[in-house]
């Protein structure tokens, strides 16, 4: 039986808006949009159409919000059981499940309509596939049944760069799939670091997250190996694909070294909550800066500066006597 708290009615429309806004889990969405925007800048070689960018980000926001609302509906039983999530709109009784479902459907329809009308059909279909995969594969099939839930389910969170690339080009080449792979491999270290901190919550409601099923030591070993897989993947954009250059590559090296250091520290002390929290926070910082580096590297001005620096370096080298 699914329980809810008896909450007082909303006293005004502002409280209603606040409750529905909370259903969308808004803190999760910006990171998805950053990866979308980075893909668009790379695909357009730094000359992204601002209208297309705006519509794509709005459509992506609506799609992500729809997925999160549906997730809140599905997880209302375990949200009620956990003190940390009991105050959410549905388990607290502030929003009824049927109303939340209607809200989610409206968000999804608006998202697809924006993509189909103002961008292209492929980007809209990809956005909808993210919702379907997140709900059917991650939330329904995997989350409560497999410790690999966020590994496979992480594909849903890796779709935004595909949407962004398709919005610009109308198709998908190798580069967007590398972006997909980067986020896919980034997800386990990011999410398992969080799971290490709230392991008891998941255990309380019988959700088989990796730390609950395999323990901290096994979890941090897997965090370590996924980190080692992810970092080299980030350099594939530079070589062999050549869609990003030296600026991005240099920043990726620095960020990658920092990520490896933090993952190694956690591997050495798997029960240290402070290190787990540090890795979790850094993983967010890492992805944001990596995507920012992609954008900066793609700009025509950056290319001009790098060419000028290369020419000056060649000139200096030519002045050095060979013997």
Swiss-Prot record:
One Pfam family name is UbiA
Its keywords, alphabetically, are: Cell inner membrane, Cell membrane, Heme biosynthesis, Membrane, Transferase, Transmembrane, Transmembrane helix
* Gene Ontology annotations for the cellular component aspect, listed alphabetically: plasma membrane
Q: What InterPro entries is this protein classified in?
A: Protohaem_IX_farnesylTrfase, UbiA_prenyltransferase, UbiA_prenylTrfase_CS, UbiA_sf
Which GO MF terms are attached to this record? protoheme IX farnesyltransferase activity
Q: Tell me how this protein sits in the membrane.
A: Multi-pass membrane protein
Q: Which residues cross the membrane?
A: 28-48, 50-70, 101-121, 122-142, 150-170, 178-198, 235-255, 282-302
Recorded superkingdom: Bacteria
**Protein's pathway:** Porphyrin-containing compound metabolism; heme O biosynthesis; heme O from protoheme: step 1/1
The reaction(s) this protein catalyses: heme b + (2E,6E)-farnesyl diphosphate + H2O = Fe(II)-heme o + diphosphate
Q: What is its EC number?
A: 2.5.1.141
Q: Which GO terms describe its biological process?
A: heme O biosynthetic process
- Primary location class: membrane
**Location of the protein in the cell:** Cell inner membrane
Family named by the database record: Belongs to the UbiA prenyltransferase family. Protoheme IX farnesyltransferase subfamily.
Q: What does this protein do?
A: Converts heme B (protoheme IX) to heme O by substitution of the vinyl group on carbon 2 of heme B porphyrin ring with a hydroxyethyl farnesyl side group.
Q: What is the name of the protein in this document?
A: Protoheme IX farnesyltransferase
Q: Which organism is it from?
A: Rippkaea orientalis (strain PCC 8801 / RF-1)
Which gene produces this protein? Answer: ctaB
């Amino acid at each position: 039986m699914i329980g809810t708290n008896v909450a007082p009615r909303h006293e005004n429309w502002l409280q209603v808006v606040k409750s529905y806004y909370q259903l969308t889990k808004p803190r999760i969405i910006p990171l998805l949009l950053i990866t979308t925007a980075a893909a668009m800048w790379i695909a357009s070689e730094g000359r992204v159409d601002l209208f297309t960018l705006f519509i794509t980000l709005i459509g992506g926001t609506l799609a992500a919000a729809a997925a999160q609302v549906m997730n809140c509906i599905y997880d209302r039983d375990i949200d009620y059981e956990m003190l940390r999530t009991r105050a959410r709109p549905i388990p607290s009784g502030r929003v009824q499940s049927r109303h939340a479902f209607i809200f989610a459907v409206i968000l999804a329809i608006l998202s697809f309509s924006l993509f189909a009308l103002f961008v292209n059909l492929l980007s809209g279909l990809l956005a909808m596939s993210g919702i379907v995969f997140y709900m059917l594969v991650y939330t329904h099939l995997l989350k409560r049944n497999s410790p690999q839930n966020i590994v496979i389910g992480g594909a849903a969170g890796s779709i935004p760069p595909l949407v962004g690339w398709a919005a610009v080009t109308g198709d998908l080449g190798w580069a967007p799939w590398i972006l997909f792979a980067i986020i896919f491999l980034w997800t386990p270290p990011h999410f398992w670091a969080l799971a290490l901190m709230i392991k008891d919550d998941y255990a309380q409601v019988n959700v088989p997250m990796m730390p609950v099923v395999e323990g901290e030591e096994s979890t941090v070993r897997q965090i370590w190996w996924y980190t080692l897989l992810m970092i080299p993947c980030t350099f594939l954009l530079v070589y062999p694909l050549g869609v990003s250059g030296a600026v991005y590559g240099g920043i990726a090296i620095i960020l990658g070294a920092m990520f490896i250091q933090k993952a190694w520290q956690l591997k050495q002390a798997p029960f240290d909550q402070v290190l787990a929290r540090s890795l979790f926070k850094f993983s967010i910082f890492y992805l944001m800066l990596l995507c920012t580096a992609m954008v900066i590297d793609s700009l025509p001005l950056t290319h001009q500066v790098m060419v000028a620096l290369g020419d000056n370096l060649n000139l200096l080298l030519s002045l050095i006597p060979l013997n």
